[in-house]
Regions:
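Short secondary-structure boundary/capping segments
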Residues: 71-73, 118-119
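Well-ordered beta-strand segments characteristic of repetitive beta-sheet solenoids
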Residues: 101, 169-171
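Amphipathic hydrophobic-ligand
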Residues: 27-41, 115-133, 160-168, 183-194
Length: 194
């Protein structure tokens, strides 16, 4: 696949900033573009097999995701497969921390191409998300548990759905899940619970 990068800037020791990123899918269609991707990494946890990102930003995201039908893979599947371990005989445990993930000015399109879209009707087979803005803290993600705080997610969908703010905290393991401080705000309604 083709990947192009406009500019790479290495900050103090552990920060990387990449401007004007574009990746095509295997058919040559635009798959992922971003005006800026930035991350600040913590190297000390790597010695213990942990991945720690103190902050990450994704600005001007434009993602075009599709699949031909319900049974075919998404056009991004080859990227996910390339990230998977080639050694299937042993398992490397996942241990990930992201102190702060900020997404601004994002757009995500998802389409299942064998189903015709209905204008003005929300459909999980045809998402047209714009004005995506998010602030997420991934306290801890392992094979066994997750500790996640969604400070804010806001977006608009082409169907007319407008999510002004979604926030919650999630703590889950293999036995139970606890959802706290949940709040969702739409243009004319709001729901929240502790």
């Amino acid at each position: 696949t083709q990947v192009s990068i406009g500019k790479v800037n290495l900050g103090f020791f552990n920060r990387i900033i990449i401007d004007d990123v574009m990746m095509l899918d295997q058919k040559g269609d635009s798959m992922i573009c971003a005006s800026r991707v930035s991350a600040k990494l913590d190297f000390l946890p790597l010695k213990d097999g942990k991945i720690s990102v103190s902050s990450a930003q994704l600005f001007g995201l434009n993602a075009n995701i599709y699949k031909q039908d319900a049974k075919s893979p998404m056009n991004i599947q080859f990227v996910l497969d390339s990230l998977a371990s080639k050694d299937t005989t042993r398992h490397t445990p996942l241990d990930l921390h992201i102190g702060s993930l900020i997404i601004r000015h994002g757009a995500v399109a998802y389409n299942q191409r064998d189903i015709a879209p209905e204008p003005g009707v929300f459909s999980p087979q045809h998402l047209g998300i714009t004005d995506l803005s998010a602030h997420i803290i991934l306290g801890h993600l392992t094979d066994k548990d997750i500790h996640l705080a969604v400070k804010k997610i806001a977006l608009k969908d082409k169907s007319g759905l407008q999510l002004r703010n979604l926030r919650f905290k999630l703590d889950a393991d293999q036995q139970q899940a606890l959802l706290r401080d949940f709040s969702i705000e739409l243009p004319h309604s709001q729901l929240q619970f502790d």
